[in-house]
Amino acid sequence: MIVHYFPLIFLLRAVYRRSEDGMVVLAALLAYISFHVGIMFFTPTNLPTEVYTSVLGISANASLLVTKNSGILVPFHTGLIGALVVLYFTRSSAQSLKKRTPYSVFSFVDKNVSVVFRSIILSLLAGILLTFIWPMFINFFLNIFTFISKDLNNPINLFIYGIVNRLLSILNFSHWMNQLFWFSNLGGSWVDPVGAVHTGDVGMWTAQLARNISGFTSGKLISPLYILNIFAVPAFILAAFQTYTDKLVHKRLIPFVILAVSMSILFGTLLPIEIFLVFTAPLLFTFHLFFTAILYAVLPMLGVTLGYSFTGNVLVGTPGSIIDLLVLIRNPIYQKALVILLFIGLMTFLLYYAVTSYYYRRGAISIINPNEKEICFKES
């Protein structure tokens, strides 16, 4: 659920950090709601069902309204983009009203109230406008998805999948892509011995694992996540931790580092790390993005196709954890793939540790230790 509400959390946090004013935060929350209300009433109904989601329970019965639509109306998912739109209008409203003079037309209206109403109205109009633009955004990515799905055995297609998947994850759209590739025909299909058809990479893997059949046709979209969660993320955390030079800070962060590494290995914490990299170390994120894409392209060629057995909502799915991997250890069908995965994982750990250490020590020391150069200068 944290992933689902991440855009709203990001919005409220960003507004509060800039203004530290409770009324501006309230304005952002109400503007976010009005933004999705505007989308709900004007949203097209011909988009894939995966792109629609009820934000904060926002929905309406179309039969009670004067509309051509039927059923329950819900807004389409806007992810982090929607939060950024509302953030812009909330901040601009707050800043413009700071410059308001006592002689303005609406000087009799309290400034805080003006911020709230202006943010709500502008966000509502932005939501309505977005309903005319958003279908082009959706169709653009649908064309990319269709291109990728035409040949999931092609390393180039898998390379593109890796890049698109991680970029959409940052924008809070990965659940849409995952739903299509995990459980629909875009991820492939497989007919079991009794004639039942199973679709999607995760759907096929779940069925094949239940029948003790090697997932030679599935698992390729999940395998890289094992390496990233179990090896890459812990390496990044440990390397970043080692760049702290203050012994007191170093000691205080040890419990957090242990917890973060454990969470990544047991449950997967790839997304929070990626978001951190986007805002603090874009170059390091670029390295991570292309290395992830390379893993998607190379692992199937090496025979490493270890999937994720799951049948629930993609929003709560946590693929790539060591718990899922331990289930496969005793199965002789997957032992060769596990050995290769372990070897590549160890190489990945060393690579991420080296790249992260070099980046923070030589290229971006100020991000983690902003006063380190200053201190060294004064001491000398």
Describe the role of every protein-language-model region.
Residues 1-102, 110, 279-302:
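Early transmembrane hairpin of solute transport permeases
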Residues 6-18, 78-99, 179, 221-248, ...:
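Transmembrane alpha-helical segments in integral membrane proteins
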Residues 35, 39, 82, 86, ...:
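Alpha-helical transmembrane segments of multipass membrane proteins
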Residues 178-181, 187-192, 203-232:
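Individual transmembrane alpha-helix segments
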Residues 194, 202-214, 234-242, 256-260, ...:
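Transmembrane alpha-helical segments and their short flanking loops
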